């Protein structure tokens, strides 16, 4: 079984810790993973994960994504000068990644905690969609309680990529699929109350579904409540395979091939 974790985070830029996580992932059948940024610290840790994997004897192949998520507005401000500084810092980080940079992210909109920052979030999201398009990179998109605005901006700035950790309705999933996006399902699908996620997972075509951990968050059952990591993606794979009526090996291979098409 070959597994591809299309979205995970490393919260600390600790080479020893990262190497241990990667070794456990490799032992669990993870052949590739994408380490995802979203803040200066996460971007650095994602870049380090790619470096550690390249030098390790036992590790999956690691690509990475860098970006600034919506939370950075509160941390870094939204004046013209601050926006310029953020964009420059991000582009400098991306330029140093060379062959390991596979996507721009995570980026997107989240109105759950800070709906008052909607305008600033849209502006930041739009700038990064433009940068990803300039670099010919797919995007890793977070959307929470903001799907209509997310769709609107993706229509305005045509992009390709992944709607990560999808938790929306089946109908909304179809609308993202109509724009050409892949839908990535996390361990949330194994949670007892996640009927909506399971329903959505069933409408995604075989050639557009991906799996992810979003680690260190959202550990799947039977590990819910502990820190998540890429090695645990096997549980999500097996759960979704049973849900969709296919073998775990076949589903792992399908999602691996899908991920390679969009992320490499």
Give residue ranges: language-model regions:
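Mid-domain alpha/beta scaffold segments of enzyme catalytic cores
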Residues: 1-264
């Amino acid at each position: 079984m070959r597994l591809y974790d299309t979205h995970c985070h490393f919260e600390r830029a600790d080479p020893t810790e990262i190497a241990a996580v990667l070794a456990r992932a490799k032992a669990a059948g993870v052949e590739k993973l994408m380490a995802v940024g979203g803040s200066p610290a996460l971007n650095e840790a994602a870049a380090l994960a790619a470096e550690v994997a390249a030098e390790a004897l036992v590790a999956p192949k690691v690509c990475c994504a860098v970006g600034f998520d919506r939370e950075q507005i509160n941390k870094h401000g939204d004046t013209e000068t601050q926006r310029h500084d953020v964009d420059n810092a991000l582009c400098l980080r991306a330029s140093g990644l060379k062959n390991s940079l596979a996507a721009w992210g995570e980026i997107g909109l989240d109105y759950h905690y800070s709906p008052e920052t909607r305008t600033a979030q849209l502006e930041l999201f739009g700038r990064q969609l433009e940068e990803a398009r300039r670099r010919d990179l797919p995007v890793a998109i977070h959307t929470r309680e903001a799907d209509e605005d997310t769709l609107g901006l993706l229509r305005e700035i045509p992009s390709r990529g992944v709607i990560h950790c999808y938790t929306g309705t089946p109908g909304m999933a179809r609308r993202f699929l109509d724009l050409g996006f892949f839908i990535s399902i996390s361990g949330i699908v194994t949670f007892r109350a996640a009927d909506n996620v399971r329903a959505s997972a069933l409408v995604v075509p075989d050639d557009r579904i991906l799996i992810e951990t979003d680690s260190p968050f959202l550990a799947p059952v039977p590990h819910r409540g502990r820190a998540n990591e890429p090695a645990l993606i096997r549980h999500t794979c097996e759960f979704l395979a049973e849900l969709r009526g296919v073998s775990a090996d076949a589903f792992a291979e399908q999602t691996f091939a899908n991920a390679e098409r969009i992320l490499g």
